């Protein structure tokens, strides 16, 4: 489906400046998204799962708004790379409301690797 196809373009280390609020105050907007997927249940409930090493302010909500726009054909399925490259908040989709957003888990450190890394997963549930 369109949203899952577009979600694959979010995977990797990118500058997600377009997916955070203006004047965010962060030194770096580069983040790693290790997985992004969209699932639609039979009752039309939409699940958007995003996993990464950390998220910017409203990043998951803006990703969700952008993917919903793509699913509704308000944006092209191949628009994610140009949005990322632009670094322009206005180029991305709307910020989805916080209701339904759930931080599922956080894991610190990677056992056996000697690396200290935070991995978090957020899930956004949207009902019709």
Segments from the language model and where they lie:
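Structured-RNA-binding interfaces characteristic of tRNA pseudouridine synthases
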Residues: 1-128
